[in-house]
């Protein structure tokens, strides 16, 4: 079975380490980046299957980065992982081209299911987020 290739983007080193540990049994983390501008370069260079993006980052936030990536023709599927659990952020993330949205407080339970669903072409939003 081929492991999905993931580009992991978060400006917090501690979160990067936790996220990578959660992913590595099932997915290949091809590299990490610390801001939205760096992900533009790394995505073009590495062509990952999935981009895991934080929203609040320096230089260029995740939503702006996702819009630019999609406009440039990037084929990677995008999942946002963020502390922002309100509907406005979820809707902005999905409108920017993401298929997935995971709140960081639920990474341990939601991250791998989100990647599996998105890799299969389906959407995923952390069940703890009310979309009513």
Regions found by a protein language model. Name each.
Residues 13-31:
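Two-component/phosphorelay signaling modules centered on CheY-like receiver
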Residues 32-50:
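Acidic, metal-coordinating helix/loop segments flanking the phosphotransfer/catalytic sites
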Residues 35-38, 60-64:
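Acidic catalytic/metal-coordinating carboxylates
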Residues 41, 63-74:
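Short amphipathic alpha-helix used as the core "switch/output" element in two-component signaling
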Residues 57:
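Receiver (REC) domain active-site loop signature in two-component systems and cognate sites
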Residues 84-85:
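Short, conserved "switch-loop" micro-motifs in signal-transduction and mechanochemical regulators
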Residues 88-95, 99-132:
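Short, flexible helix-to-coil linker/hinge segments that flank and couple to helix-turn-helix
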